[in-house]
Curated annotation (Swiss-Prot):
The modification Phosphoserine is found at S36. The modification Phosphothreonine is found at T47. It comes from Rattus norvegicus. GO terms for cellular component: contractile muscle fiber; costamere; cytoplasm; M band; muscle tendon junction; nucleus. The lineage of its organism: Eukaryota, Metazoa, Chordata, Craniata, Vertebrata. Residues 19-63 are annotated as: Disordered. This is Small muscular protein. Pfam families: Chisel (PF15355). Plays a role in the regulatory network through which muscle cells coordinate their structural and functional states during growth, adaptation, and repair. It comes from the Eukaryota. Coiled coil: none annotated. Keywords: Phosphoprotein. Belongs to the SMPX family.
Length: 85
C-alpha cells in the first residue's frame, strides 16, 4: 500500500482553532464600560413619582402590575396535598 503525501494545507486546517469573529475589528479587547456622570448618585433609589419613562420602551396594553406585590402574595401561598382538602 503506497502512502500518499500529506498536504501541509490539510494539516494546518485540521489543527487550527480560531473562534468565530476573531478577525473582526476590536476582537480580543474587553467591551468598554460606560462611564457614569459624576453628578449622579447611583445608590439613591428613585421614587415612583421621579421615575421617567425610558425612551423607546414599549407600552403594553392593560394595567401596570407591581411585581413585588405578586411575589409577596406568591410567598404567602401554601401547597396543600390532595388528601388534606
Amino acid at each position: 500500500m503506497s502512502k500518499q503525501p500529506i498536504s501541509n494545507v490539510r494539516s494546518i486546517q485540521a489543527n487550527i482553532n480560531i473562534p468565530m469573529g476573531a478577525f473582526r475589528p476590536g476582537a480580543g479587547q474587553p467591551p468598554r464600560r460606560k462611564e457614569s456622570t459624576p453628578g449622579t448618585a447611583e445608590g439613591a433609589p428613585a421614587t415612583p413619582e421621579e421615575k421617567k419613562p425610558v425612551p423607546g420602551m414599549k407600552k403594553f396594553p392593560g394595567p401596570v402590575v407591581n411585581l413585588s406585590e405578586i411575589q409577596n402574595v406568591k410567598s404567602e401561598l401554601k401547597y396543600v396535598p390532595k388528601g388534606e382538602q
